[in-house]
Swiss-Prot record:
Gene3D superfamilies: Cytochrome Bc1 Complex, Chain C. It comes from the Eukaryota. The chain crosses the membrane at residues 33-53, 77-98, 113-133, 178-198, 226-246, 288-308, 320-340, 347-367. This is Cytochrome b.
Length: 379
């Protein structure tokens, strides 16, 4: 008799995706981040749901409702901090996942890569709106500054900003709609993640060597299920250490002050995972130019498959490209540091150099070095 998991319509989908899926035998720990992102998403939806049961999206009570969650709700403090720090873990996994894709040439799977870029944008939008909800000083001013960037769009900019605000400033209408979008977007992200997997399973996974692994496949279960469980345990260990020992380490102290439209904080900055993009935005003196650079800093990922000039897929056997990749990593860390610094000398010039270098590496240096490597190998 055939096993039910291979015949039942629903079980068959699960079986073909997580049990009998043929996987390359040599994929490293860098391939763990996809499943970790899935775990992060489930964790965020679960904790977010419980937070939404007690949160009120009204300017008069939003801040105190978050305080109420932390003080009066059973285990409310741990739910709140798991959600806040879970977002940080989410972005760490996202950056690692995208970095893996860049390093090993996973962007050759165009459909999977493009859905991934949409997922990245959707996650960033969700995180931004979530940061506004506690209605602290940084929530309010962050929302004001970032939404105001849209006013740089010619002709329709001002009207667009007021339409998003639902008035002439960030107020009750803005908070309510941000809560609505923050609630619905994770479910859209979950649906997109399924499409992401659907496209991935059309081609099968890439592997560190970058060559086809059709001749050497192993079943996903038990080999990679057990490997993923190890990754999940490590992720949860780091997350819970953060939540239980220093929950406010990655937050901003200004957000413990209720939002006040009459008092601007000395340094307005977003959460740490947006600082690299914020630094790129600030490094251009022109408003519209800054906004375009900000958008393009992520959208540039869509160009990567078209700029692939190497005859090898991954960077495993390309030391010159590896040097550039790690230079890019260092550059992004520099941008993250600059994004959190005040706008003054020498931070301005460091930010501008790092921003130029970021685009230069991806658009000019990497394709050029790849051609040089091809010639060195007489290809």
């Amino acid at each position: 008799m055939t096993n039910i998991r291979k015949t039942h319509p629903l079980a068959k989908i699960v079986n073909d995706s997580f049990i009998d899926l043929p996987a390359p035998s040599n994929i490293s720990a860098w391939w763990n981040f996809g499943s970790l992102l899935g775990v992060c998403l489930i964790l965020q939806i679960a904790t977010g749901l419980f937070l939404a049961m007690h949160y009120t999206s009204d300017t008069a009570t939003a801040f105190s409702s978050v305080t109420h969650i932390c003080r009066d709700v059973n285990y409310g403090w741990i739910i709140r901090y798991m959600h806040a720090n879970g977002a940080s873990m989410f972005f760490i996994c996202l950056f690692m996942h995208v970095g893996r894709g860049l390093y090993y040439g996973s962007y050759v799977f165009m459909e999977t890569w493009n859905i991934g870029i949409i997922l990245l944008f959707a996650t960033m939008a969700t995180a931004f709106m979530g940061y506004v909800l506690p209605w602290g000083q940084m929530s309010f001013w962050g929302a004001t500054v970032i939404t105001n960037l849209l006013s740089a769009i010619p002709y329709i900019g001002t009207d667009l900003v007021e339409w998003i605000w639902g008035g002439f400033s960030v107020d009750k209408a803005t908070l309510t709609r941000f809560f609505a979008f923050h609630f619905i977007l994770p479910f859209i992200i979950a649906a997109l993640a399924m499409v992401h997997l659907l496209f991935l399973h059309e081609t099968g996974s890439n592997n560190p060597s970058g060559i086809t692994s059709d001749s050497d496949k192993i079943p996903f279960h038990p080999y990679y299920t057990i490997k993923d469980i190890l990754g999940v345990l490590l992720l949860l260990s780091v997350l819970m250490s953060l939540v239980l020992f220093s929950p406010d380490l990655l937050g901003d102290p200004d957000n413990y002050t209720p939002a006040n439209p009459l008092s601007t904080p000395p340094h307005i900055k977003p959460e740490w995972y947006f600082l690299f993009a914020y630094a790129i935005l600030r490094s251009i003196p022109n408003k519209l130019g800054g906004v375009l650079a900000l958008v393009f800093s992520i959208l540039i990922l869509a160009l990567i498959p078209h700029l692939h000039t190497s005859k090898q897929r991954g960077m495993m056997f390309r030391p010159l490209s590896q040097c550039l990749f790690w230079l890019l990593t260092a550059d992004l860390l520099t941008l993250t540091w600059i994004g959190g610094q005040p706008v003054e000398h020498p931070f301005i010039i460091i930010g501008q150099i790092a921003s130029i270098l970021y685009f230069a590496i991806l658009l000019i240096l990497m394709p050029t070095i790849s051609i040089i490597e091809n010639n060195l190998l007489k290809w």
